Amino acid sequence: MPLFDLKSPYSLAGDQPQAIDTLTKSLKNKNHYQTLVGVTGSGKTYTMANIIAQTNKPTLIMSHNKTLCAQLYSEFKAFFPHNRVEYFISHFDYYQPESYIPRRDLFIEKDSSINDDLERLRLSATTSLLGYDDVIVIASVSANYGLGNPEEYLKVMEKIKVGEKRAYKSFLLKLVEMGYSRNEVVFDRGSFRAMGECVDIFPAYNDAEFIRIEFFGDEIERIAVFDALERNEIKRLDSVMLYAASQFAVGSERLNLAIKSIEDELALRLKFFKEQDKILEYNRLKQRTEHDLEMISATGVCKGIENYARHFTGKAPNETPFCLFDYLGIFEREFLVIVDESHVSLPQFGGMYAGDMSRKSVLVEYGFRLPSALDNRPLKFDEFIHKNCQFLFVSATPNKLELELSKKNVAEQIIRPTGLLDPKFEVRDSDKQVQDLFDEIKLVVARDERVLITTLTKKMAEELCKYYAEWGLKVRYMHSEIDAIERNHIIRSLRLKEFDVLIGINLLREGLDLPEVSLVAIMDADKEGFLRSETSLIQTMGRAARNANGKVLLYAKKITQSMQKAFETTTYRRAKQEEFNKLHNITPKTVTRALEEELKLRDDETKIAKALKKDKIPKSEREKIIKELDKKMRECAKNLDFEEAMHLRDEIAKLRTL
């Protein structure tokens, strides 16, 4: 029986059928690695969705940045509305890890800010994986970081049935063991409240509903689900499965074992420092660890508890830590890992371990942490790539690693469903590049189309932006310090024609879906390096591939080896695309992508502004507006539009003060 129910208005076209067939056969033949080489705009995401539906396995889709993760999450939610599509990225809005700089004798405390919505989504992902098979998780590099033992997590979860005998007080203690906190005043995620013989539990992985358990003596009489906002009963249940409020929650037996294990390690390390006559390190470690042990004994947690993860999970020193992969593979279940934009993602994954180890080794050496803190780490690249699962690498420009691992299990997806060709390209002398490009931009703007320009340095980007603005062009500059929300706003403004030209350095490559862009200009294309490598050039040139008038200008004094290889790849693909179009009588059409959904949120904003301008709003009307806005705020948070959710939250606060 199929696990996944794929819904889409699209039909397969171009190279999609053969790519899906090739890769699905490879996966069903139990091959460990396979690669999809798909050009920009060829519908790789839809191909991935079809492969998931046909292979019928829980799937982890990994990407190298949060922006692309959010985009993939939105697309897969639409493709699989009846399945569990989850989102797993870092839950920190801000994170400064603890560190020590010996030459300055400077210890920097850990400082972080946890995003409540992202934490909920992470918990939702792990609970779905433990309870269901029809799960697709969209994840960032966070999937490689340590989590609690999934088997311990299963032990802590609790199935509650109507009619079963349970001591009321022991049930409350069980909730505390599961990581829930009792709070009679502020009832929100991860908390519970007890009123008479009723216990309300707000699951940590759900912000829309809470569960009410009604007792009659020591017997559970009724279980009901309530709407968290309206506080009205939605449905009654015969039983309910309640999961822990934390991915690090453990039972009392495991907790006691962990405390004993930490004490034993502390004794050994203190003995080492004493023998080395390192009194400062001895006292520092003793004081810090004993304080943490007191907190763990009293509350089950402490600040920086992740540094003791090995003791809670039962892992041996240097053993591979538990991570999201272990939740996918629970019960020896087969699963698929899709690495999107693998040419960037895999190198990023490879560099994580070394940086983490360098910082923590200093903390251990100087007595700030026990040696077991080194085992709270991301996966080493070898551990990641040799996980007991199947991998599908997806990229327009895969590296040698992906192709060597995949051997013959490689599928090309060069033909676009729209018939669009890889863009024409032209090399021009860089001596007069600013004036020459200005003339080209005017022609593009006259056609109501947009331009992307990539430079090598921040200074050149700023100066170019200044020059073109003075010459009358509507131009913006996007630099590396701009966060994801502002970046999305700039891209949206470009699509809405609030300006015509966007200049950047390394922000114009992967994942930018801009059908309005018909001209991409690459300044100083002959300066060999990361930003002008074969892969970077092909990715950048691909930004013009969603428009029928797509064209790339490369300004250079010579043609480098990277340029030559990029030209050969583009020429090969374009020839194959032209041949397919001619054979099937296809006329290339510019991709169209609606902005209606993005604009809808702005309509809500306008309504709020009008409401706030009123000097007097009747109390009944004000409560109605607040309730409506609160509902929209929750919807925005669910859809990962946190900017809009925060805006709505602030406006609700203003209304409550009227």
Curated annotation (Swiss-Prot):
Residues 623-658 form the UVR domain. Residues 25-178 form the Helicase ATP-binding domain. One of its GO terms (molecular function) is helicase activity. The keyword Chloroplast does not apply. A motif (Beta-hairpin) lies at residues 91-114. It is found in: Cytoplasm. Its main location: cytoplasm. Pfam families: Helicase_C, ResIII, UVR, UvrB, UvrB_inter. GO terms for cellular component: cytoplasm; excinuclease repair complex. CDD domains: DEXHc_UvrB (cd17916), SF2_C_UvrB (cd18790). ATP binds at residues 38-45. Keywords: ATP-binding, Cytoplasm, DNA damage, DNA excision, DNA repair, Excision nuclease, Helicase, Hydrolase, Nucleotide-binding, SOS response. Residues 433-607 form the Helicase C-terminal domain. The keyword Protease does not apply. GO terms for biological process: nucleotide-excision repair; SOS response. The UvrABC repair system catalyzes the recognition and processing of DNA lesions. A damage recognition complex composed of 2 UvrA and 2 UvrB subunits scans DNA for abnormalities. Upon binding of the UvrA(2)B(2) complex to a putative damaged site, the DNA wraps around one UvrB monomer. DNA wrap is dependent on ATP binding by UvrB and probably causes local melting of the DNA helix, facilitating insertion of UvrB beta-hairpin between the DNA strands. Then UvrB probes one DNA strand for the presence of a lesion. Forms a heterotetramer with UvrA during the search for lesions. Interacts with UvrC in an incision complex. Belongs to the UvrB family. HAMAP family: UvrB (MF_00204). The beta-hairpin motif is involved in DNA binding. This is UvrABC system protein B. It comes from Helicobacter acinonychis (strain Sheeba).
